[in-house]
Every structure is written in C-alpha cells, then in structure tokens.
Amino acid sequence: MRLTFLGTGTSCGVPTIGCRCYTCISTDPHDKRLRCSALVETAETRLLIDCGPDFRQQIMNQPFRRIDGILITHAHYDHMGGMDDIRPYCQFGEINVYADPLACQGMLQMLPYCFAEHRYPGVPAIRLHEIRPHEPFRIGDIHIMPFQVMHHDLPILGYRLTSDDADLTYITDMKTIDPAELDYLSGTRMLVVNALRHKPHHSHQTVNEAVDFAHLVGAPQTWLIHSSHDIGRHAEVNAQLPSDIQLAYDGQVIEL
C-alpha cells in the first residue's frame, strides 16, 4: 500500500491569504500546505480520502488513472469542495463516493446538478454510498472500517484501511474520541491524525494533544496533518517532536 499526502493544511491553507507571519513567508516547500487530502493505492485499488477545493492542483502531478472510490470524512467545504473537479475521471465510469448521512446530504446540496434526473452533459457522474461507523466494507483489495470521532460537537468519520500486511488509520479534524472507539484503532501500524497548532482550539487537536493521542494508540509511526500557519515552520516543529511522530508534508509518499 502506498500513501500520498496530497494536502496537509487546514481550511485556509498555508500560506494564509494576506498573512506575512514567520511561517507564511517561509521559502521551504514543506511549509506550503494545501487543504487536507490523501491518495491510497495498492496494485489494484486507488482511493481518495477527502476531495477539497485544491483537488485539481493536487492531482495534476499524479498518473491519470481510475479512482475506485472517494472516502469523505465530513461535510465541510475544505474536505469536499473539489468534487466537481473529478469529472475527468468519470470517463472511467461512475465515481463511487462513501460518506455518512450528513455528508451525503451536503453533497446533494452542494452538487444538485450531479443528481438531477436529466443531467447536463459533462457533469460528474457520482454514485453516493451512505456509510456508518463500525459497518465495514471493501473497495477492491482494501478493507475499510469507518469509526467515529468528534469535531467539537459534530460526529465525523475516521477510517482504518487494511490490505495484506498494510494497516493505516486516517483521522482529520478530531477534537475528542470516545474511549470505546479506540478498539477500532488497536494494533494499527500507521496513524495519520490532525494537529492544528500549539494553542488550544475548540474543535481541533493541538500538537500536544495529537502527540498524547499518538502515544495512546501506540502505532509505530504517526504523521500529523491539518496544520495551520500557527504551528510554525515544518523543520523546526519536527525537530522538537519524537522521531516516530512527525509532521507530514504535501507530496510526501509513504510505502506501507
């Protein structure tokens, strides 16, 4: 299994428009963060996790091949605002999109023309699949277990993906998690989880909270995503973090 971080930034991206802070003026490519999204690939299956407004830019450097499914974590624009840009991939067939009921409703409201009885030629051909926590499913050779985390008071989905010996857990926008959900993460080999900044935030984990959560899960390697400009510069933050818990960066490829 191969994991590509297409975007590792928060809803405003980094640099933030109009900002001249220490992070935003950095010339290090690792400090340029598009909105969160990831590509997960095996020899036979290709999945996208979230499809934000930077999708077109993110996918241009990737081979043009079928996308077998899109997993949506929640119904916020920075995680599904790029869905209209999947239309070139519809030449391979309908795009299967998997989301919880609230995100499915948001998709219908955001892209009503994709679900009309008589669709305009060329609009994305999307097949929505309503999924729920703890109800596993399979796409190709990847087994997927959705579980629930809390984005402040909004229940959203995390995903555990397994294929052969590869075992990846992906979480974004989490603030808290019910202890009962931890059973669904037990034994995972790689954790991807959000770390917004150092100061407390009402709906996202801080860096310290993410580190504590990583220790609780106990995965051999953890990558931190959904980071804002307030987190500081990539290299300096990583130098202060344990070697097994590091900030991810846009374009990073991990072989599992």
Please provide the spans of the model-predicted regions:
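Binuclear metal-dependent hydrolase catalytic cores
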Residues: M1-I171, A180, V237-Y249, V253-E255
